[in-house]
Structure formats: C-alpha cells, structure tokens
Amino acid sequence: MSARSAKPLVAHPDRPRQGGPDRAEVEVAVGVLIRPDGAFLLTSRPPGKVYEGYWEFPGGKVEPGESVEQALRRELVEEIGVVIGAVHPWRVERVDYPHALVRLNFCKVFEWSGELHMHEGQSFAWEMLPVQVRPVLPGTVPVLDWFAQERSFEGPTHTQGA
C-alpha cells in the first residue's frame, strides 16, 4: 500500500485536538466494497458516534494482535453482516480529527457473501462519482479523489453539507 503523504489530512483545523500533539495514532481497517458495475458502498456513521450521520466506507479499529485484514473481516461481519473474500490492500491515509489521529488502511474488496444488514443502525448507499449522499466524512474524500483518478472522472466527487 502506498501512503498519500507523511503529513496527515487535517479535519476541521479550527477545533482543538483531544489528547494534544503527541497523541497515539489509531490503526483502522477500511473496506472499499466495489460491485461489478463499479458502484461502491458507503455507510452512514451510526447514532451516538462522533460525526454521526456522516458517510464513510465501512470498517473499524484494528485490535491488538490483529492484522489489518483480520480486523477488516471482523468489522464487516459485525457492522454490515457480510463475509468478505480476498482483501486487496490499496492505500493508506492519515487523518487528524479533533477527537483522534487515525491511520486509515483502505482495502478494496470485490467479493463478499451475505445480505447487507446494518447492525449499528446506520444507513447504506451504493454510489458512483459524484456521490449523492452527504455530508461525507473528511477521511472519505481522498478515496473519492483516488477513484476519480482511476476512473478518469472530471468534476466534483461529492457535495459537502448536510
């Protein structure tokens, strides 16, 4: 996997950072599920979580002793009820959110089994560029840009705002 840059994307720079400048990075496994028609899955952040209602790619924290792939497999069963096939590590992006500094390990997934079931009360949407759902989580934006590059898409990848 290649990193976009060593410097993290800063989300909401006007807000104070919890934990200060020396806070630990949280390792996160993120699944970019892609259908044969090229549509990709976005889910909304569930009620009660930071950035509630924002749209993102599904995934979650890597637990101690887990690999990114193991965490992704576990998280996608827990969150959306699917068992995934091959995991294709794609890109890494660091994002400095006010509540956490995260290292997002994006993995493409083309095969899965089971019906989508949102176990945390979130919504889901199969999207193409430009995505229609909003608001989009800041850590999701680089992925939309990468898709635009891969797919030779010109124009805005999303619309921000509620």
Question: Language-model features: where?
Answer:
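Conserved hydrophobic/aromatic beta-strand scaffold that supports enzyme active sites
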Residues: 32, 42, 104-108, 126
